[in-house]
């Protein structure tokens, strides 16, 4: 049984743990042998001059996703700049055929507008989803997948599980990924093995 962590900022001590480590384009990038990474421009660090560096790093063979990218109304950067950088990363993900891992805070309308306008081909995964079930349904209907950590709403978790578009993550938490799986499996009334199998299948499908 493999417990996939689709989004973390903490490289796993055991390289046999399948985890996608998220690195901002402003941070040093020193990939470990065998590691998997996502590289992007976070809306908290929005700056157009980071796009060339992002493009260079995104082509690295150990970078399997783009992000985290997205929109955040609590960030200092103007929303217009955030949208510009987000759209650039959407296009980059499509160009490189890599999934996009998304950070979104209070900007769901803008996020869906970008998706409708650009009509991307690459999979989109909203990380750390904490919204309610109606928002989850809206995002799922638009073709997105949702990733959950320890903090979430049970109704949205169930909605996403029923649609088979659920991923699991630790984000920046020190909690072991196995405990996150145990928590989510318990709320869904399924075995950890069943949840792990579903997430593994979904994760593998991202790249085929």
Regions found by a protein language model. Give the residues of each.
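Mid-domain alpha/beta scaffold segments of enzyme catalytic cores
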Residues: 1-208
């Amino acid at each position: 049984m493999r417990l996939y962590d689709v989004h973390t900022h903490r490289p796993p001590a055991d390289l046999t743990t399948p985890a996608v480590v998220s690195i901002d384009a402003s941070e040093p990038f020193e990939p470990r042998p065998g590691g998997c990474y996502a590289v992007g421009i976070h809306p908290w660090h929005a700056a157009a001059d980071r796009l060339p560096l992002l493009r260079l790093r995104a082509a690295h063979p150990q970078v399997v996703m783009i992000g985290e990218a997205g929109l955040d109304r609590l960030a200092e950067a103007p929303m217009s700049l955030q949208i510009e950088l987000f759209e650039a990363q959407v296009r980059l993900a499509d160009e490189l055929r890599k999934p996009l891992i998304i950070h979104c805070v209070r900007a769901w309308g803008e996020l869906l507008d970008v998706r409708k306008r650009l009509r991307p081909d690459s999979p989109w995964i909203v990380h750390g989803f904490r919204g309610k079930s109606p928002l989850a349904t809206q995002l799922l209907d638009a073709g997105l997948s949702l990733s959950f950590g320890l903090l979430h709403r049970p109704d949205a978790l169930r909605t996403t599980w029923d649609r088979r578009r659920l991923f699991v993550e630790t984000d920046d938490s020190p909690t072991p990924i196995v405990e996150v799986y145990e928590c989510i499996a318990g709320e869904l009334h399924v075995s950890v093995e069943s949840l792990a199998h579903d997430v593994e299948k979904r994760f593998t499908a991202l790249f085929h």
